[in-house]
């Protein structure tokens, strides 16, 4: 449903933001 789609999108956004942050901190 719609809520599942929103949760999936939020999870993806959170994961990519976490990856970017990790790259800044550790230099990938």
Swiss-Prot record:
GO terms for cellular component: extracellular region. GO terms for biological process: defense response to bacterium. Keywords: Amphibian defense peptide, Antibiotic, Antimicrobial, Disulfide bond, Secreted. Has antibacterial activity. It is found in: Secreted. It comes from Rana latastei. Disulfide bonds join 23-28. The keyword Disulfide bond applies. Belongs to the frog skin active peptide (FSAP) family. Ranatuerin subfamily. Pfam families: Antimicrobial_2. This is Ranatuerin-2LTa. Its main location: secreted.
């Amino acid at each position: 449903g719609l809520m599942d789609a929103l949760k999936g999108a939020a999870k993806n956004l959170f994961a990519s933001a976490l990856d970017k942050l990790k790259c800044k901190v550790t230099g990938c």
